[in-house]
Each structure stands twice: as structure tokens, then as C-alpha cells.
Design a protein with these regions (language model features):
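Short S/T/G/P-rich N-terminal loop/turn motif that feeds into the first structured element of a domain
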Residues: 1-52, 57-69, 81, 85-109
Length: 109
């Protein structure tokens, strides 16, 4: 499993407007329906009103490659340009071992 954190930063509320447009236009729902997509959610940092965090999770690199080759990417690129967003990306590959036993004591279930 591959998890991508995309930090979209803009000005004058552009990042939030971008995320809202992605949801209202149905693009976010279409991405969630793509084969191999496991998660696609936007979050808003309390201390940075001009940034939006997208957590995007995929089964494998092939699913990401198919997503990047889809016609949807042109829509996303156009919206990024419209709102003049800049991005920072973090990529995580899961090791599937779960949390170590010693860390579980800090987790309330």
C-alpha cells in the first residue's frame, strides 16, 4: 500500500476552494471509485488556513500509474492552475507489519 500526502498551498483561500471544487464537481468521488484507490480525503490544518492536506492511498504503483494516465488528471491540473496552488509531496510505503506491541499501549481503541 502506498500513501501520498499532498500539501496544496495557495493564497486568499485558494487551496480550500480547490478542495471544495474537487468534491462538489464529483472529481474526488470519481477518484475514490478508481480501481486501486483506498483513500482520498482532504484535511485543513488549524494553524495554516492557506494549506490543504490531501491523503491519497493506493493499492500499488500500478494503480497510481493508471490514475496518472486517466483523463481526470487534466481536470485536476486545470483546477490547480486556476487556484495557483503549489504542492509539497510526501510518499509512504506501508510495511504491513502493523504497530509494534510496545506502541499499542498509547492507543485507545
Amino acid at each position: 500500500m502506498i500513501t501520498i500526502h499532498l500539501y496544496y498551498t495557495g493564497s486568499n483561500g485558494g487551496a480550500r476552494a480547490f478542495a471544495e471544487k474537487m468534491v462538489k464537481s464529483g472529481v474526488a468521488a470519481a477518484i475514490r471509485a478508481e480501481d486501486g484507490n483506498l483513500r482520498y480525503e482532504y484535511f485543513f490544518p488549524l494553524e495554516d488556513p492557506e494549506t490543504v492536506l490531501l491523503i491519497d492511498q493506493w493499492r500499488d504503483q500500478a494503480a497510481i500509474d493508471a490514475h496518472h494516465a486517466s483523463p481526470m488528471m487534466a481536470q485536476i491540473a486545470a483546477l490547480r492552475e486556476k487556484y495557483d496552488l503549489h504542492m509539497r509531496v510526501e510518499r509512504f510505503v506501508s510495511d504491513d507489519s502493523g504497530l509494534p506491541e510496545k506502541d499499542l499501549k498509547f492507543i485507545k481503541r
